[in-house]
């Protein structure tokens, strides 16, 4: 897959973070946008095995052998919103019950999705007494994602 990182949504130059879209649900056909999310962070982890053979005169060699993605979303708990309720509903789940469909649509239209992403809910209403209740979740990729390039 080749993404042109200089062209997003048919435009050139920079883009606002709000152009990213996140959906969650039991399956792709029932997934909806998660309302009231304010911030997101993505963390790519890469497994690199290194070794230092004698024939490289002390210079290390390496090979990337694994990948992982973790997406953190933070916002407000919106009771009654389908996507927000789906995520919050994972808070007391374990095992495969903590999994679900998750999709990240990039500003250029590329989508990355998992049918069994792991929802690690961190907060479903906390904050100080004058704050709006929070919803915070880390979505961990679970296996190789489906990557669909923008058309």
Where are the regions a protein language model picked out?
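Polar/charged alpha-helical tracts
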Residues: 7, 39, 108-110
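Extracellular/virion structural assembly segments
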Residues: 57-117, 124, 130-133, 143-151
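Solvent-exposed edge beta-strands and adjacent loop segments
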Residues: 9-78, 116-136
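C-terminal edge-of-domain segments
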Residues: 137-141
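N-terminal leader/targeting segments
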Residues: 1-8
């Amino acid at each position: 897959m080749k993404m042109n990182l200089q062209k997003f949504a048919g435009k050139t130059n920079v883009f606002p973070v709000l152009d990213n879209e996140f959906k969650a649900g039991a399956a792709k056909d029932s997934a909806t946008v998660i309302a009231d999310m304010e911030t997101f962070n993505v963390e790519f982890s890469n497994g690199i095995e290194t070794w230092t053979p004698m024939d490289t005169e002390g210079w290390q060699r390496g090979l990337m052998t694994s990948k992982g993605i973790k997406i953190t979303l933070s916002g407000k708990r919106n009771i009654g919103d389908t996507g927000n309720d789906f995520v919050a509903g994972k808070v007391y789940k374990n095992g495969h019950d903590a999994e679900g469909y998750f999709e990240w649509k990039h500003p250029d239209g590329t989508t990355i999705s998992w049918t069994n992403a792991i929802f690690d809910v961190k907060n479903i209403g906390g904050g100080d007494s004058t704050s709006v209740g929070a919803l915070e979740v880390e979505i961990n990729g679970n296996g190789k994602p489906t990557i669909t390039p923008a058309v």
